[in-house]
Amino acid sequence: MFGENSRDIGVLSKEGLFDKLEIGIASDITIRDKWSCGEIKKPETINYRTFKPEKGGLFCEKIFGPTKDWECCCGKYKKIKHKGIVCDRCGVEVTLSKVRRERMAHIELAVPIVHIWFFKTTPSRIGNVLGMTASDLERVIYYEEYVVIDPGKTDLTKKQLLNDAQYREVVEKWGKDAFVAKMGGEAIYDLLKSEDLQSLLKDLKERLRKTKSQQARMKLAKRLKIIEGFVSSSNHPEWMVLKNIPVVPPDLRPLVPLDGGRFATSDLNDLYRRVINRNNRLKAILRLKTPEVIVRNEKRMLQEAVDALFDNGRHGHPVMGAGNRPLKSLSEMLKGKNGRFRQNLLGKRVDYSGRSVIIVGPELKFNQCGLPKEMALELFEPFIIKRLKDQGSVYTIRSAKKMIQRGAPEVWDVLEEIIKGHPVLLNRAPTLHRLGIQAFEPVLIEGKAIRIHPLVCAAFNADFDGDQMAVHVPLSVEAQLEAKVLMMAPDNIFLPSSGKPVAIPSKDMTLGLYYLMADPTYFPEEHGGKTKIFKDEIEVLRALNNGGFIDDVFGDRRDETGRGIHIHEKIKVRIDGQIIETTPGRVLFNRIVPKELGFQNYSMPSKRISELILQCYKKVGLEATVRFLDDLKDLGFIQATKAAISMGLKDVRIPDIKSHILKDAYDKVAIVKKQYDDGIITEGERHSKTISIWTEVSEQLSDALYVEISKQTRSKHNPLFLMIDSGARGNKSQLKQLGALRGLMAKPNGAIIESPITSNFREGLTVLEYSISSHGARKGLADTALKTADSGYLTRRLVDVAQDVIITEKDCGTLNHIEISAIGQGSEELLPLKDRIYGRTVAEDVYQPGDKSRLLAQSGDVLNSVQAEAIDDAGIETIKIRSTLTCESPRGVCAKCYGLNLANGRLIGMGEAVGIIAAQSIGEPGTQLTMRTFHLGGIAATSSTPEIITNSDGILVYMDLRVVLGQEGHNLVLNKKGALHVVGDEGRTLNEYKKLLSTKSIESLEVFPVELGVKILVADGTPVSQGQRIAEVELHNIPIICDKPGFIKYEDLVEGISTEKVVNKNTGLVELIVKQHRGELHPQIAIYDDADLSELVGTYAIPSGAIISVEEGQRVDPGMLLARLPRGAIKTKDITGGLPRVAELVEARKPEDAADIAKIDGVVDFKGIQKNKRILVVCDEMTGMEEEHLIPLTKHLIVQRGDSVIKGQQLTDGLVVPHEILEICGVRELQKYLVNEVQEVYRLQGVDINDKHIEIIVRQMLQKVRITDPGDTTLLFGEDVNKKEFYEENRRTEEDGGKPAQAVPVLLGITKASLGTESFISAASFQDTTRVLTDAACCSKTDYLLGFKENVIMGHMIPGGTGFETHKRIKQYLEKEQEDLVFDFVSETECVC
């Protein structure tokens, strides 16, 4: 267990150090002779009169040691001078009482007892070794049936079960001595002892080789793995049956006296007492030669008592304690949040800490925090005492403490001295990312609240409505140094998740800066004056200070001489030799801007401030940026105070056009209602159309209101507009509710209530409207409570799966790469290429397109912002970069594949815990978003547009589109995978454009992907102009359109079975709807060329839920609607849908309504119907290869006969199953899919997370392979092994001339991947504790303590950051040098002597 140690942990003694930890099954001899200090024979705990432990009982002092330090039980020996003496009267050793936390005892069992973990935990270890089922084992263990151990000369077989009647029959027939059959633990013990594992292993391997059935092979491989575990370890199978039970030290299961003479005891004592009582009773019964039936019952009861002790409730009913509560067994002590692992080993209480309410400290510098004097006195007490003793002010610790309590003046002086340069750590719970703990220089303050700098609030997610924070004091020099160098607030001004600044002025500061930098509103020419010209900035500032400034509201504030200047006045000033037109406010602002950034001459909303801070960091470094941030904070607060912006009711201006727009909307809703009444549209469509109308109204009014408040009036700026436009407070959605209308509201289930709230908050809501509002508000609060827990659990799983991913080397030298491009939606670019490639390593040289002489980036370069921008500007669409997904480091990842550390813009350092950073980056916004749901107040936010409008002039070209001319004269799209391209007018023919686009020889100005049923308003090849409507999208239905003329015939549309006629209650009209059915019917509409139905022209499958729009025998023309499938009511999008989606992706779950995807490239065809499923065939015309897909008739197809599809393309509606992408398209495509899908969820919420974080999680999900053919290796069929282990084993086998194993990549969800980690300590502390430990013990697994969690649990320094091996090597080298110096010094002295 203890290996040669290379760790330097400082605090632990050298004997306490170890490099690895091995777990195994303890033998009876180990329990009795090595662990135990004596046998417990009595169930008594303490004497009721003396309250002293009973001799031989569960708290016996003779076995466990004395209850008082250096004092034996009878009092003969007291004091330390008798150390180590064993009292001759009471037998107690004189030692420290803390040995009662270490010394164990044992209970000698009357009969062998089966350990419930090895029998009940799936897969059953005992069952697998013996080849018996769990139910058979249970009947034997609990004394219901006999099992044959040795059949002798009888016709019985080994391991055959016999009930009482059969047993008596066999005894009568063959005699009692002719065979051996037993019950209970004894029988299992004998069977396990007699099992020849080597021959069993051979036999299983042989059977595995011969078996062809996949299922049987999987079963055999699982059993083989367990047997191999026993063979390769020093464990004996019979050790799974206990003859002795270890007893936990008494101080770990204490008995505590309460008031009133009662005692509180650990549940374990009750459980042990039951075992001892039953064991003693059984021993007595066995001595008395009691009837077999009573003995058997007693043995079963003992087995149950031991089961309850190890795992209460695993077998039968749990043992209850007082108040009908199940007793906590040893398993419960380890499991779950309050178990030993998570409660005591991974989360400990910390001394030298305190907590208090926080308040804002605008006077603080960025690296400071205000610490209440009383708190500091308590926290730094030991330091103060030492300093007081060193000064000679006091001589004992007691007198120093008294002096501190008195609050003597010298104490305060000493405290001031001590805290200089001694940082403290501040933490706010929940600590969702590493910025939740930062270090500050403490500043002593009066009062009892901690003060924090306004700019660190965002990182802590803190506000001052009663939030509390904890303070921790780093004690050792190393800890102080680490806090100073790595954790100080100025070192943490960027988010590790995206590299964006987190320390940005907000609220009042933003408002003050925006006000200062606002566009000129005072033009002297309009007031009969001239534009003032100043020779430099100082002159402007002097004018400002001398004359005061002219206020927006109070007009001029000039001095007696009439001098003065308006803060927003248009002036001219000479700066750096140039005359610039600006405002005095901007001159004032530029006084604090570093000169390298140039003169900032534009308004300053919060987004621009953020960009300025980033720019500042890149140009002038951290120190100057931090100074700039402090100056921004001060200036912002001063200007906000001076501007005194406040909001009045009149500032909320209701748009004049409101009543007109509302009247219009009501008219449109009435038309839709009439269409419904006439039976033209369905209830679902009516609902959807109504919602679309109100959404549009909502947007119109919102825009009108924003324009209204942005107009300047007599007092120049509307305060409401200032607040929103600056980004200080509020947004357009909230403004809309204040002054336009509240709009559509959502029900708690997400469905939108179709009657909107047309009032706004300025007008006031009616009672009904208020009642509707409460829906949304309540949903928000309920969501917050429920989803926070979900998000926290997701973060925990992510941390667990990625915790051991650290930077282990500079460069792994891989040639692998991934390709990335900009992300767009239609013609809109959501994420430019430069943002995606910044900070990544280029995998191959990047040249200017068409100019090989101009190198933009060299292979191996880590791209900075300048290079990234140059590549983007050069028009390069895709670029090959290195990624953690393709990194070949044997453990962890390399710095080059990871790229820059986003928190500081430098290459990531060695030992950096990138896995945990990744998990926090993904988990933190999830929690934030769930907490923020209610800010929308349940306002319906539907994101879909009913029309496509072009933003450029050019020629419209249809690409990959099948269209048919509709009845209105417009083209209707018949296939799904096509697009409309707008290309520059170069005077070519349409065919030339199409050819150039297909070969990517020309760039499109815009691309609009279109789907089935889109109505294109412009013909192919027609010129279009900016702002022109080119297509209409059907939002409410998926249409099924006819593309050939002919006559209709219904096929399998049988009323009452596959269809039903529904009478519309309002109109009385009958609608034919296809319903779900279980028969052999396959509803479709066939089209024949004439009324006699002689020749079939085409068939159209009709999915369930569709409404048929044509009648049988009717003549139809191309473009006519045959049927329509309502899209259902639109639900609001919210991260509440998003978080489960992220969990579904990272857990690699199969989505509920999964889509079918094409397995090969080819053309779609249909081949009839079989067992309620449509046979869809994809045929590759080049190779003639065909792939069949059986698709349920209820599923909606998104491809049609004759469509070309590519491998991996969706054939039906729904979400894709990730495992299928892996199987069909391979690992690279799956990685791309998972990264993009997770990003999609966060992007919808406007959350920015760098791809590299998601890539690390995906890498962890794909780190295993599944063995398909073990070859000559020791690997097993169907086993999931680490890629590293797989390649290593294959290399060894090939060197020995054997056949290597074959494997396929396997995708594991994060929970499964966490449990499959190499470290059993880490896995056990995550989930399934008992199963993980049982598994590890059977195979005698060794934990090499390579990850973080296992080292924290063992109390070692973590192998990351400053604890990384490189750092440790430096430390050891320095220590060795010191030793050599000492040795040299000693030698020299000896020579002198």
From Swiss-Prot:
Gene3D superfamilies membership: 1.10.132.30, 1.10.150.390, 1.10.1790.20, 1.10.40.90, 2.40.40.20, 2.40.50.100, RNA polymerase II, clamp domain, RNA polymerase Rpb1, domain 3
Any GO CC annotation of this UniProt entry: DNA-directed RNA polymerase complex
Co-factor binding comment: Binds 1 Mg(2+) ion per subunit. Binds 2 Zn(2+) ions per subunit.
Example GO biological process: DNA-templated transcription
Binding-site list for Zn(2+) 1: C72, C74, C87, C90
Catalytic activity: RNA(n) + a ribonucleoside 5'-triphosphate = RNA(n+1) + diphosphate
Binding site for Mg(2+): D463, D465, D467
Domain of life: Bacteria
Binding site for Zn(2+) 2: C812, C887, C894, C897
Any one GO molecular-function label of the UniProt entry: zinc ion binding
Swiss-Prot/TrEMBL keywords: DNA-directed RNA polymerase, Magnesium, Metal-binding, Nucleotidyltransferase, Transcription, Transferase, Zinc
Pfam family, one: RNA_pol_Rpb1_2
EC number, as in UniProt: 2.7.7.6
Essential cofactor(s): Mg(2+); Zn(2+)
InterPro entries linked: DNA-dir_RpoC_beta_prime, DNA-dir_RpoC_beta_prime_bact, RNA_pol_asu, RNA_pol_N, RNA_pol_Rpb1_1, RNA_pol_Rpb1_3, RNA_pol_Rpb1_3_sf, RNA_pol_Rpb1_4
Keyword Iron: no
This protein's record includes keyword Amino-acid biosynthesis: no
Subunit annotation: The RNAP catalytic core consists of 2 alpha, 1 beta, 1 beta' and 1 omega subunit. When a sigma factor is associated with the core the holoenzyme is formed, which can initiate transcription.
PANTHER family, alphabetized: DNA-DIRECTED RNA POLYMERASE, DNA-DIRECTED RNA POLYMERASE SUBUNIT BETA
Protein family membership: Belongs to the RNA polymerase beta' chain family.
Main function: DNA-dependent RNA polymerase catalyzes the transcription of DNA into RNA using the four ribonucleoside triphosphates as substrates.
HAMAP family from the UniProt entry: RNApol_bact_RpoC (MF_01322)
NCBIfam families hit by this protein: rpoC_TIGR (TIGR02386)
Full protein name: DNA-directed RNA polymerase subunit beta'
